[in-house]
Amino acid sequence: MEEAEKDESEVDRMNSDINFRYAERKDIPLILHFVKELAEYEKMSNEVVADEKTMEEWIFEKQKAEVIFALEEKNEVGFAIFFHNFSTFLGRAGIYLEDLYVKEEYRGKGYGKAILKKLASIAVERGCGRLEWSCLDWNQPSIDFYLSLGAEAMSDWTVYRVAGRTLRELAE
């Protein structure tokens, strides 16, 4: 991973220069573009059915998720989509990171770490008990990156999903 090859002081210095902003309605096309680029990287492009209308509805009208952008100067170079979940064991909310994406030409420059630090800061400010996310098991560069930050793989847990037709059938 390129990030590991960087001098730590250089990466930390760069992180202090990274600014963030919350997404606004006008950002819907960019959000969807980043989602599609992430899906391509994850070899899941065919699974993206979201469109601008559904993104606007769920992010801005129903306020079910939040989006922050990492900026280099005034240019969006990466983003995170996240939402609150709840831990009954902790008795408090947490933050679930749905998507973390940095444009390819900006990878290895500290943006991913800066985004996670920003999300950790948001979680602490809001009194959340944890920050969690999923990672594809073949994505070793990301796994190594997360482990380098102190994240722990939840090897005792398996994610289950019911979607589409199966979800509708279960609801009957």
Language-model regions, residue ranges each:
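Conserved acetyl-CoA pyrophosphate-binding loop and the N-cap/start of the following alpha-helix
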Residues: 106, 110-118
